[in-house]
Every structure is written in structure tokens, then in C-alpha cells.
């Protein structure tokens, strides 16, 4: 009895004094990490970027398979060249990317966001940038909340085909169709690529939602600067891959015709990075299909481009 009694307080004290203990035991060891980089560059202590995988797919209402998205993107990332042809640098090696083991997603939407929040909170507290990979769009709220708590002026740049502004869907507050509504409870949002929404989606009166529909900017080259101007200094970037044209990301649960081209989407993201501080981002709704690697590879490539933009523009400002 004495031995058991003496051990319990020690465990409790250790957990309280080391809040990053939960992240430490999740770190992937060895070379099977995101981008297959040198393990020395993939430790939690060394890396500036931290990958959180959440293959949650409990509220899917059309095409399935998003639960397999994180693993497919992870595998595809190991085929991505690390040299950035635009900047002539290897930002991924310069700053390091830590990969965490996939989260247990056998739960409901509220619980998975609680789990993501607990991990992302420790990542953000350590001065690192969380990269959340879904899974369906339901998962974004937990990471946004973690960033919002550290950066109270946070706003969200939301690339998507769908506005996701329903207050609830199929009786659920946490659903892939309510992702932006939950985020809007915390901060204002700028949406781009939208081409599917409800007639009435009010949003929060004190936290506006600025919508850039796909049809409005198809012939315009100036909308990106206007969109970025509506963002606050600190920004969370959430990307549903169906915000891009299906020719770029064909394997997704609810594809819509039209959308951002590859370079139009990258241009918007780069402009945001140039004048704002990206403190976290996610890529969601990849639903791999057998016989094609196009979508998951494009998603891995997109993540590498965002890392390059954040490294080149945001980290150079020493703003995190």
C-alpha cells in the first residue's frame, strides 16, 4: 500500500509540471515521418511545424473515405521534393517538421475536437505551428480554438466549395456542414471558392463572415488583395480541398464544379502570408480512391507550399 500511495502523487505532479507530456509520447520516431526527413529534424524540440492527423469521418453525408485521407497524404508526402523551386531553398529542412501519431477518432464530433484542441494547445504553447490533416472538415474547430486562445485577434481564411455555415446539420452541432459556423463562434472569417450555400446564413453579428463566391472573381485579378485586407494580423488557414477545382483535387467527398485553380489558390495563400501571420493551418476532406494518387499528392504538395510561404514570409518576421 505504501508503494502505491507514493507513486500516485509523483504521476500527478509530473503531469502538471510537464504539460507537453501528451505530445511527447505521440511523436513518430524514425524515418517514417511526414516528408521522410532526417529524424533529427523531426523531433518536437527541433521542428517549427507539427503535423496532427485526425482521420475523423463520422458525419459524412455523401462520398466517404476521408478517414483514409491523413495516411494517404502522409505516404504521398514522402514523394515530395524538398527543394522549393520558387524560393531556391529547402524550408522543410531549415525549420523541421515533427509528425505526431494519428489521433484516435472513434468518437463524436465534439470529442474529436476536444482531443485535437488538447494536442494543438500544447503545440501552439511551445511556439510551433500546427498542421492539422483531416478527415472531414468537422475537425478544424479544435485547432482554431487552440490558436485563438493564444492569439485573441485571430481571424480565419477559409477555402472551400461550401460555406459550412449551418448552425447544425442532421441534429449535430459538430458536423462537416457546420465547421465554419463553429469557427465563427470564435473569430471572423474570410471565405473563398464558395459555390454552394444556404439562402440564409447570418453568422455572428460581431464576427463578420466575408464571402467571395467563385462566380464573382473568375474574371478578376484583384479580389485576393481585398480578401486579405479583411483578415486580422494573426490568421488560421483552413482548406477544404473541394475549394479548388475538381481537376486539381478530384478525390473528395462533396465535389463541386468550378473553384480555384492551383495557382489562383496558391496566390491567395501567398498574399495572406506576405502581410499576415499564419499561426496554424489545416487541409481536410481528401477521400482517396483506388488507382489514383493525384489528390493526396496534390494535398501533400499544397502543404509543402504553405510551409514555404509561412517560412519565407511569416517566420522571417519573427512574429510567432
Feature annotation, model-predicted:
Residues 1-14:
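Polybasic, lysine-enriched low-complexity intrinsically disordered terminal tails
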Residues 3, 16-320:
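Conserved alpha-helical scaffold segments that buttress catalytic/binding sites
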Amino acid at each position: 500500500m505504501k508503494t502505491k500511495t507514493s507513486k500516485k502523487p509523483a504521476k500527478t505532479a509530473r503531469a502538471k509540471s510537464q504539460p507537453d507530456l501528451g505530445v511527447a509520447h505521440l511523436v513518430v520516431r524514425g524515418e517514417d515521418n511526414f516528408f521522410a526527413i532526417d529524424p533529427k529534424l523531426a523531433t518536437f524540440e527541433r521542428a517549427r511545424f507539427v503535423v496532427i492527423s485526425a482521420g475523423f469521418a463520422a458525419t459524412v453525408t455523401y462520398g466517404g473515405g476521408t478517414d483514409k485521407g491523413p495516411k494517404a497524404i502522409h505516404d504521398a508526402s514522402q514523394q515530395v521534393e524538398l527543394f522549393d523551386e520558387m524560393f531556391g531553398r529547402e524550408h522543410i529542412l531549415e525549420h523541421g517538421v515533427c509528425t505526431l501519431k494519428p489521433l484516435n477518432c472513434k468518437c463524436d464530433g465534439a470529442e474529436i475536437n476536444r482531443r485535437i484542441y488538447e494536442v494543438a494547445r500544447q503545440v501552439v504553447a511551445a511556439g510551433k505551428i500546427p498542421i492539422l490533416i483531416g478527415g472531414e472538415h468537422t475537425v478544424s474547430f479544435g485547432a482554431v480554438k487552440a490558436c485563438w486562445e493564444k492569439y485573441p485577434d485571430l481571424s480565419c481564411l477559409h477555402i472551400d466549395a461550401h460555406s459550412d455555415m449551418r448552425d447544425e446539420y442532421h441534429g449535430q452541432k459538430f458536423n462537416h456542414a457546420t465547421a465554419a459556423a463553429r469557427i465563427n463562434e470564435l473569430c471572423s472569417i474570410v471565405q473563398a471558392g464558395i459555390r454552394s450555400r444556404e439562402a440564409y446564413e447570418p453568422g455572428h453579428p460581431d464576427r463578420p463572415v466575408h464571402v467571395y463566391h467563385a462566380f464573382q472573381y473568375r474574371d478578376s485579378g484583384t479580389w485576393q488583395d481585398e480578401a486579405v485586407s479583411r483578415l486580422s494580423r494573426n490568421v488560421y488557414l483552413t482548406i477544404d480541398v473541394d475549394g479548388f477545382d475538381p481537376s486539381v483535387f478530384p478525390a473528395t467527398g462533396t465535389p463541386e464544379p468550378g473553384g480555384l485553380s492551383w495557382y489562383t489558390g496558391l496566390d491567395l495563400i501567398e498574399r495572406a502570408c506576405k502581410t499576415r501571420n499564419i499561426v496554424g493551418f489545416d487541409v481536410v476532406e481528401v477521400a482517396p480512391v483506388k488507382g489514383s494518387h493525384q489528390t493526396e499528392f496534390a494535398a501533400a504538395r499544397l502543404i509543402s507550399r504553405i510551409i514555404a510561404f509561412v517560412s519565407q514570409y511569416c517566420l522571417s518576421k519573427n512574429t510567432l
